[in-house]
């Protein structure tokens, strides 16, 4: 796996680690739940279960490319490549699903979730494309 693909996979993992931090560690801060997620403070108790679980989902998802890169550099290149590809593919599909939920305006005004969907999908797609060469 070339260096560009590895760097892009690491970026994809970092995006998901950032999401974990926002959703689990910092979610109760108004700048996060109101500023990033557009959730009013009054709705915080109703959304805390969601943010906690989705945050850990993102943490576990970030572990895929990280573990894949570790395997790649510790004598298990084939397993590492496949784990990076699978994890990035999963992230790409999750980003597409997030984009669809934005188009359908499932929880916020249409278009307000576009940035999150792109942040989730683009680095993983770029890593997959780079890994093909």
List each language-model region with its residue ranges:
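N-terminal signal-anchor transmembrane alpha helix
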Residues: 2-26
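Cytosolic, membrane-interface loops and tails of multi-pass inner-membrane proteins
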Residues: 25-47
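Interfacial helix-start motif at the membrane-water boundary
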Residues: 42-61
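Transmembrane helix-loop-helix
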Residues: 67-122
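Hydrophobic cores of alpha-helical transmembrane segments in multi-pass inner/ER membrane proteins
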Residues: 123-127
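Juxtamembrane boundary at the C-terminal end of a transmembrane helix
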Residues: 128-133
């Amino acid at each position: 796996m070339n260096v560009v693909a590895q760097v892009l996979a690491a970026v994809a993992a970092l995006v998901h680690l950032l999401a974990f931090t926002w959703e689990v560690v910092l979610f109760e801060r108004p700048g996060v739940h109101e500023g990033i997620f557009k959730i009013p403070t009054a709705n915080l108790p109703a959304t805390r279960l969601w943010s906690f679980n989705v945050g850990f989902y993102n943490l576990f998802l970030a572990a895929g490319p990280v573990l894949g890169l570790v395997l790649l550099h510790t004598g298990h290149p084939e397993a590492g490549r496949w784990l990076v590809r699978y994890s990035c593919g999963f992230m790409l599909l999750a980003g597409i699903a997030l984009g669809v939920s934005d188009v359908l305006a499932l929880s916020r005004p249409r278009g307000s979730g576009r940035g999150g969907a792109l942040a989730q999908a683009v680095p993983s797609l770029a890593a997959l494309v780079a890994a093909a060469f």
